[in-house]
Amino acid sequence: MEKFQRLDRSHYFLYPLIFQEYIYVLAHDHGLNGSILLENAGYDNKSSLLIVKRLIIRMYQQNHLILSVNDSKQTAFLGHNKNFYSQVMSEVSSTIMEIPLSLRLISSLERKGVVKSDNLRSIHSIFSFLEDNFSHLNYVLDILIPYPAHLEILVQALRYWIKDASSLHLLRFFLHECHNWDSLITSNSKKASSFFSKRNHRLFFFLYTSYVCEYESGFLFLRNQSSHLRSTSSGALIERIYFYGKIEHLAEVFARTFQANLWFFKDSFMHYVRYQGKSILASKGTFLLMNKRKDYFFNFWKSYFYLWSYPGRISINQLSNHSLDFLGYRSSVRLKPSMVRGQMLENTFLINNAIKKFDSIVPIMPLVGSLAKSKFCNALGHPIGKAIWADLSDSDIIERFGRIYRNLSHYHSGSSKKKSLYRVKYILRLSCARTLARKHKSTVRAFLKRFGSQLLEEFFTEEEQVFSLTFPRVSSISRRLSRRRIWYLDIVCINDLANH
């Protein structure tokens, strides 16, 4: 990294780094899908360095870099086939191209004085942000992020970040060698993700991140164009004909004279959230303003990414009549009616008042679908035994089921209704009993009668344990707190049931 910083920043010569051994070590240490140099074909740690050295020597020779991944003969190269060779090169190339982006990000954070906070990485921090801001908004744009129609669009997006033409040509080589790229990225995004997870996982995430970065530049334009003048009093009036000529002067004057009456502001009521190939743009603006933003995105995609997007990719919804389904929660803004009784002298009157309140619940069907996919129940939600765990010890089986429920309960603690978690607890509890009964060749009834309530000890939620330790003498307070929505700032990923 220090060697790269000493290079001429106007050129960013990255291609020579592919011939440096330490780059392969960096790719190995920071690879998203683990080691590809050490965990292939039985090579150990010592011989992997020899593979890298021989690989670099062969690349110096003419015509050894041009090898086809789709060659049906799969000619061996250094004891490996060409798929392994291309995978190593793509991982290293993506690592090299990430260097200028990382340096630019670090310098930007240092220049702005942004303090690193691990709590901001928590998924629950998104919901606490929505809870504080979405109740004041009116409309929301639900956007499906379009996929690039051609691989050259991905390369062109990187030209603004990477100035080294040789590195971009090498990237084109890897993209062209990936068979059926166009059909993978346009027809089925899940299939594309599965393909790259097996071959070029890191390269795929790098390209997708750079593409989304260019896609989100359109939001920055909207943010800059949303500045307007707001008046809270008629005490100060500005002649419209001289408005644009007085902007610079007004910026210096309003802080001293008109601070209570006039101010410039960039639409602080426009908020943006991106997740899992989708994005949300919420605003306090009118339906006409949201429709103009929708047209802007269509024109932006068509002119910049050469995409003809169908209208269903962007929908305008009113927050009071719409629910947002993302990250395992169903969030909405509802009107909570309230009535206030007042009295003035001898007259009594009632005041009806509706308060907007952000609410989040956990839909049960996606949870049941995840449990069914992991073979804890069938499609209807009826618990079944985990046959693959029947060979484990009783304590390991109970510990695994208990850990899964504690993780799910911890993640969905922000739900205002706990019925979904009770259903999950029932499914996992009975699935655990069926698994243990299968192991001991007994029935579920006989097994539960034998062990009794001891089977439930592992299914106490982590929240209940924390509350019991925090309020050991006031059980009513702990029970009341356990029924409320709680956001944790230590959750950085969604638990995948298939990995347990």
Curated annotation (Swiss-Prot):
Pfam families for the chain: Intron_maturas2 (PF01348), MatK_N (PF01824)
The entry's keywords: Chloroplast, mRNA processing, Plastid, RNA-binding, tRNA processing
Source species, domain of life: Eukaryota
Molecular function GO terms recorded: RNA binding
Keyword Plastid part of the UniProt annotation: yes
A cellular component annotation (GO) from this entry: chloroplast
InterPro entries, per the entry: Domain_X (IPR024937), Maturase_MatK (IPR002866), Maturase_MatK_N (IPR024942)
UniProt GO BP: mRNA processing; RNA splicing; tRNA processing
Role of this protein: Usually encoded in the trnK tRNA gene intron. Probably assists in splicing its own and other chloroplast group II introns.
HAMAP family in alphabetical order: MatK
Family: Belongs to the intron maturase 2 family. MatK subfamily.
Protein name in the entry: Maturase K
Organism: Helianthus annuus
Classification of source organism: Eukaryota, Viridiplantae, Streptophyta, Embryophyta, Tracheophyta
